[in-house]
Regions:
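Metal-centered catalytic cores of metalloenzymes
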Residues: 2-6, 14-18, 22-80, 84-146
């Protein structure tokens, strides 16, 4: 009888431990990138600017963390945003604005809704950087899972 009680206690503790850590075991970090080019704007922009977005999305915390480097813009960045949902040939509204405009690199983070995370994972977001000379956007790239 003591052996049964001991085994039951050990099994209960084991199951409780597994359940306590189960959500963390299903979490994942996803990596995203976008190559930013003037030719990718809709409509295309005649410019020499280019850049690269790298981002990670933590599925447990729903936090998107990003860094954007850019060079050869026609002027300083005036604004930058994640837009969606849209394919590479369409425009869409802002879903995540960059809060602090600085020189390259731009860095930030945002907490996404489930719908935003689904659009991001489906490749329906793009990122672009705006300047005074190109108010609609000077460089753009479709954000894709790596």
């Amino acid at each position: 009888m003591k052996t049964f009680a001991l085994r039951s206690t050990i099994a209960s503790v084991g199951i409780a431990t597994l359940l306590a850590f189960a959500p963390a075991s299903f979490a994942a970090t996803e990596t995203y990138t976008a190559e930013l080019k003037s030719a990718s704007e809709v409509p295309p922009v005649d410019g020499k600017g280019s850049g690269m977005l790298t981002a990670t999305y933590d599925t447990a915390t729903k936090k998107l963390t990003y860094s954007v480097t850019f060079k050869d813009l026609s002027g300083p960045p005036a604004a930058a945003h994640f837009h969606g949902p849209a394919d590479a040939k369409s425009n869409a509204g802002v879903v995540v604005p960059v809060k602090e405009m600085t020189a390259s690199p731009l860095k930030g983070e945002a907490t996404l809704t489930d719908a935003q995370a689904a659009d991001l994972a489906a490749g329906k977001w793009y990122f672009n950087v705006h300047t005074a000379n190109n108010k609609g956007g000077e460089i753009r790239g479709q954000v894709m899972k790596k």
